[in-house]
A protein has these predicted regions:
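C-terminal substrate-recognition "lid" of short-chain dehydrogenase/reductases
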Residues: 78, 219-248, 253-254
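Catalytic loop of short-chain dehydrogenase/reductase
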Residues: 132-171, 183-184
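Conserved glycine-rich Rossmann-like NAD(P)H-binding loop of the short-chain dehydrogenase/reductase
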Residues: 27-42
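Short, small/polar-rich loop/turn modules that mediate ligand/substrate recognition or access, typified
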Residues: 85, 170, 175, 241-243
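Substrate-binding pocket helix/loop in short-chain dehydrogenase/reductase
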Residues: 95-96, 103-108, 211
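Conserved glycine-rich cofactor-binding loop
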Residues: 12-13
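Alpha-helical segment proximal to the catalytic Tyr-Lys
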Residues: 124, 167-168, 239
Length: 256
C-alpha cells in the first residue's frame, strides 16, 4: 500500500517486532513504539532494510500523556495513520492471592489503558484514512486461571474494548479486531517457563519440552505466525472484517 502508515506498539521484541518487520512489506512507513530505544533501533534497521521508512518513538504508553504524543509525532512525520496495532503490554504473571494493587494497576495501565488511549488519540486520523485497528489480547481471556489471574482478566477486557471500538467504527469507517495468541515462543514465554518449571519440579529445559503436551498442542507458535495474522487484519482483504476475535493458539482452547 503506497503512502500508508502503520503504528506498531511493543515493537522492540517478540510479536511486536515480528509484526513491524512483516508490515514493512505492505506499508510505506512504520511508527515503532516501545520503551527500549536500543531494541527499537534494531527493529527499525530491519524495517528500513525492507524499503519502508521507520520512525522510532521510545515511550511508556502506561503514562497518560504518551498516547497523544505518539500520534502527534506520527502525523508530523507522515501526515496520516492507516493502521494501529496495539501489541504492547506485559502483565505480571502472579497468583491471584499474591498480586498487589500496584501490580494490577501497572498491568492495566499499559495493556488496557495504553491501547485505549492510543486508539482514541489516533481515531480522527484513522477515520480520515478509513483505517484499521488491531488489539492484541491472548487466549487466556477464554480461560482465566488463579496462578496468573491478571493476564486472563486484562486480556478479556481487551476483547471487550475492541468490540466497543468496532461498534463505533462501523459508523466511522474504522475496522477494529482483536487477536488471541496462545503459547508463542518469545522472550516473555521463556521468562514464564523459568517461573513455571520449579513449580512443577522440572528444569527449565524439561518444562520447555513438556509445556506443549500440558497445553494440548503440538508445538509453540512463532512470532512470525502471529505477525502474518496481524498483517492480514490491516490489509485490503480484511476490509469487511470488524468486531471479530481471532484466536491463533495451535488448538490449545478446545471449546466451541
Amino acid at each position: 500500500m503506497s503512502n500508508s502508515v502503520a503504528i506498531v506498539t511493543g515493537a522492540s521484541q517478540g510479536i511486536g517486532r515480528a509484526t513491524a518487520i512483516r508490515l514493512a512489506r505492505d506499508f510505506s512507513a512504520l511508527v515503532l513504539v516501545a520503551r527500549n530505544r536500543a531494541s527499537l533501533e534494531e527493529t527499525a534497521a530491519a524495517v528500513t532494510a525492507a524499503d519502508a521508512k521507520a520512525l522510532v518513538i521510545d515511550a511508556d504508553l502506561g503514562q497518560p500523556e504518551a498516547a497523544q504524543a505518539v500520534v502527534d509525532r506520527a502525523l508530523a512525520a507522515f501526515g496520516r495513520i492507516d493502521a494501529l496495532l496495539n501489541i504492547a503490554g506485559a502483565v505480571p504473571q502472579i497468583d491471584l492471592f499474591e498480586m498487589t494493587d500496584a501490580q494490577w494497576e501497572g498491568g492495566l495501565a499499559l495493556k488496557l489503558h495504553g491501547a485505549r488511549r492510543l486508539t482514541i488519540a489516533a481515531w480522527p486520523a484513522l477515520k480520515a484514512a478509513k483505517g484499521a485497528v488491531v488489539l492484541m489480547s491472548g487466549n487466556s481471556a477464554l480461560f482465566p486461571k488463579a496462578p496468573y489471574a491478571a493476564v486472563g482478566t486484562i486480556n478479556a477486557a481487551i476483547v471487550a474494548l475492541a468490540k466497543a471500538f468496532s461498534d463505533r467504527g462501523i459508523t466511522d469507517g474504522v475496522q477494529v479486531n482483536s487477536v488471541l495468541p496462545g503459547p508463542v515462543m518469545t522472550g516473555r514465554r521463556r521468562s514464564y517457563l523459568q517461573h513455571w518449571a520449579p513449580l512443577h519440579n522440572m528444569s527449565v529445559e524439561e518444562a520447555t519440552a513438556n509445556f506443549p503436551k500440558e497445553a494440548g498442542i503440538a508445538r509453540y507458535g512463532e512470532p512470525e505466525e502471529i505477525a502474518e495474522l496481524m498483517a492480514f487484519l490491516v490489509s485490503p482483504g480484511a476490509r469487511w472484517m470488524t468486531g471479530s476475535t481471532l484466536r491463533m493458539d495451535g488448538g490449545e482452547v478446545k471449546s466451541i
